[in-house]
Regions:
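Amphipathic alpha-helical scaffolding segments comprising HEAT/armadillo-like alpha-solenoid repeats
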Residues: 33-47, 69-87, 107-119, 138-151, ...
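Short inter-helical turns and helix N-cap capping residues of alpha-solenoid HEAT/ARM repeat scaffolds
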Residues: 51-52, 90-91, 121-122, 153-154, ...
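HEAT-repeat alpha-solenoid elements in large eukaryotic scaffold proteins
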Residues: 53-65
């Protein structure tokens, strides 16, 4: 009969020891973490370095929502502030957000940001700028995207510029896309083909040589191209 009390006493004792050991390990592992000290450090860092990138992005979104419902003059002043922010911002994620925000406004300052972002030192921002101009359109869009394709050192940026030229569906882009067919990189050639399909409204397949022939005389041989496209749709 003595065995039962022994077991009932040993269980809570061992359980209590385990909890004590776990607590001591937990406290030892978290000795360097103190929520109050962390808050104080965050406050000091914010005072010294400013808001974190995520906070700056959040505040920018909140401010833009308010400004959209305000007067034209308020929007002009806001986008002028965005120019200053763009020039001072060191984080490319935040610059991308500034760019996307500016693209929602029709002011000279907003246009300046969208144009300047095409030459941003960060590849990600330049790609976003191509997206912006693909949606923004306008008289300058083809030339700006063409220049980015022809001059950028990064393949991903060049490919995005070609893609956005297709999204514009502007026939002024055909000469640029035709030159892209001569690029030594197959990825560039096939991106040019995809964009030519959108700009021309035709589907001549994926043969680069066929598109080269078409691009040499887009307005000629209309009947022949139409017949070829008809067979392609059937088969």
């Amino acid at each position: 009969m003595t065995a039962t009390p022994s077991r009932s006493l040993s269980y809570p004792f061992s359980h209590g020891v385990c909890l004590a050991l776990f607590a001591s390990l937990l406290l030892a592992g978290c000795a360097s973490w103190n929520p109050w000290k962390q808050r104080e450090k965050s406050a000091r860092d914010q005072e010294k370095y400013g808001y974190t990138a995520d906070t700056r992005i959040k505040k920018l979104s909140e401010r833009s929502k308010v400004v959209k419902s305000e007067s034209t003059q308020s929007q002009i002043e806001f986008t002028q502030d965005l120019v200053r922010m763009m020039l001072e911002e060191h984080d490319p994620r935040v610059r991308s957000k500034i760019l996307e925000t500016a693209a929602e406004y029709d002011t000279s300052a907003a246009t300046a940001i969208c144009t300047g972002a095409l030459q941003d030192p960060d590849e990600m921002v330049r790609i976003r700028a191509c997206d912006v101009w693909g949606k923004r359109g306008g008289d300058d869009a083809v030339q700006l995207l063409a220049t980015r394709f022809q001059t950028d050192a990064e393949l991903d940026v060049r490919l995005r510029a070609l893609k956005m030229l297709g999204e514009l569906k502007d026939k002024q882009a055909i000469p640029v896309l035709a030159r892209a067919l001569e690029d030594s990189d197959p990825a560039v050639q096939y991106r040019a083909v995809a964009s030519l399909k959108k700009v021309s409204g035709r589907d001549l397949g994926n043969d680069v040589n066929v598109w080269r022939e078409w691009a040499a005389d887009p307005e000629g041989k209309k009947a022949e191209w139409s017949i070829a496209e008809g067979f392609r749709q059937l088969f």
